From Swiss-Prot:
Coiled coil: none
Gene this protein is translated from: SUA5
UniProt subcellular location: Cytoplasm; Nucleus; Chromosome, Telomere
Designated name of the protein: Threonylcarbamoyl-AMP synthase
Family as reported in the entry's similarity comment: Belongs to the SUA5 family.
PROSITE patterns with a match to the protein in the record: YRDC (PS51163)
One function term, GO molecular function aspect: single-stranded telomeric DNA binding
Length: 426
């Protein structure tokens, strides 16, 4: 049972002197089967070990939260077994409570012991609580940015907080690959509910500084393990329905899911809803409410299909010039404009055909390159949005989109949500 969207009015005024604790991911070493049998890591750096022990104590013994790096984005974690900890997550983020949370575990063994309340018995399989349809995927992709949906255990057999599921019959779970995240979960021996560690609706954080910007004074500790390598949230799949469904594109591509999932995933469909209807329940995070949005307006330049004739014969620079003119006419207060480029827009063309345009002489333009491959663009996306919004303080952001294949499916999913209705064929 969730508490309803508006319970956040109960937010307490308690503030923290938020500490950033440096940790070294390279000093954390797991055995090859630790994600299965739950073996604890070896930590060679004393400073890293001390920070993790302190953070693990907060997760295990208090109702508070800790921000920590994962391979996808920074997460804001609290005990998935403690209603008050889950409430602390919702309060710190100002997140509606009908938006479910992903539970992170360090191993299959921990999933069984702590979520299903089933200690491993001799002669039984550690995988008994995981439907067989998922096993090809998790054998290849765990630890990693893959989240699966499992049936919620009966209440008498599980301590999993109902607040993590938003009153759904399923819960979302994954084993992260980042060694800091894995070590935190393992040392606390506590499944951790963790959405992205940003203020609700903001772009997800891929650096500890992003977390500090949004959640300073709202949480006690941020573990700084450097930049996140993937750059967008995990891929969420539902193998409990027929056909199986990719609910949220993320760190693993649709193509990888189909290739590695075996025959059962060959007909995997993609959830096409941009958002759900008011009052409709969601099975996974990211499907409801405004997401990934800077303060500045975002205009997404959606690449048109080759040969469809939508913009045939129209020069991209001329098209972009007209779009800028339209925005300036609608809002005379626009002074600084950012253009986030990817595969086709070139700095030299922007300089000669846009920035030197006499009509724009009073405006400041900033170019931020996202990358030349889907992987680079995915990794850099949220950091680039935050840079131009928070550091450069622009008034308007244009983003050059990419085709929705490979990493492009996750990239465009995030950008469409950031831009809302401001998506222009380009």
């Amino acid at each position: 049972m969730y508490l309803g969207r508006h319970f956040l009015a109960m937010t307490s005024k308690a503030l923290f002197d938020t500490k950033i604790l440096k940790v070294n991911p390279l000093s954390i070493i797991f055995s090859p089967d630790a994600h299965i049998d739950g073996s604890l890591p070896t930590i060679t750096d004393p400073e890293t070990e001390a920070a993790l022990v302190e953070a693990a104590r907060i997760i295990r013994d208090t109702d508070e939260t800790v921000a920590f790096p994962t391979e996808t984005v920074y997460g804001l974690g609290g005990s998935a077994l403690n209603d008050n900890s889950v409430l602390s997550i919702y309060r710190a983020k100002n997140r509606p409570s009908d938006n479910p949370l992903i539970t992170h575990v360090s191993s299959i063994d921990q999933l069984n012991r702590k979520v299903f309340n089933q200690p491993h018995l001799s002669g039984t399989s550690l995988f008994d609580n995981i439907p067989s349809i998922y096993r090809p995927l998790i054998s290849s992709l765990w630890p990693g940015p893959l989240t699966i949906l499992l049936p919620v255990p009966s209440s008498e057999h599980s301590a999993l907080s109902k607040l993590t599921t938003a009153d759904q019959p399923t819960f979302a779970v994954r084993i992260p690959a980042n060694p800091v995240a894995r070590a935190l979960i393992a040392l606390s021996d506590t499944p951790i509910a963790a959405p992205s560690a940003n203020a609700s609706t903001r772009p997800s954080p891929t650096l500890a500084s992003h977390v500090y910007h949004d959640l300073k004074d709202k949480i006690p500790i941020i573990l700084d393990g450097g930049a996140c390598k993937v750059g967008v949230e995990s891929t969420v799949v539902d193998g409990l329905c027929n056909p199986p469904t990719l609910l949220r594109p993320g760190g693993f591509t649709y193509e990888e899911i189909v290739k590695l999932g075996g025959e059962a995933w060959s007909l995997c469909k993609v959830e096409n809803k941009k958002t759900v209807e008011k009052g409709e329940k969601v099975r996974t995070p990211g499907m409801k409410y405004r997401h990934y949005s800077p303060s500045a307006k975002v205009v997404l330049l959606v690449p048109h299909c080759e040969g469809d004739g939508i913009l045939k014969g129209v020069d991209r620079m001329e098209r972009l010039k007209r779009l800028i003119e339209t925005e300036l006419k609608a809002n005379s207060n626009i002074k600084k404009i950012a253009i986030l480029t990817s595969l086709k827009l070139r700095d030299s063309d922007l300089q000669s055909k846009i920035f030197n345009e006499p009509d724009f002489s009073s405006k400041t333009f900033i170019i931020e390159r996202l990358g030349q491959s889907g992987e680079e663009i995915q990794t850099n996306l949220f950091a680039a949005l935050r840079k131009v919004d928070e550091n450069d303080k622009v008034d308007l952001i244009f983003v050059e989109g990419i085709n929705e294949e490979g990493e492009g499916l996750a990239v465009m999913n995030r950008l469409r949500k950031a831009a809302a209705n401001n998506c222009i064929q380009f």
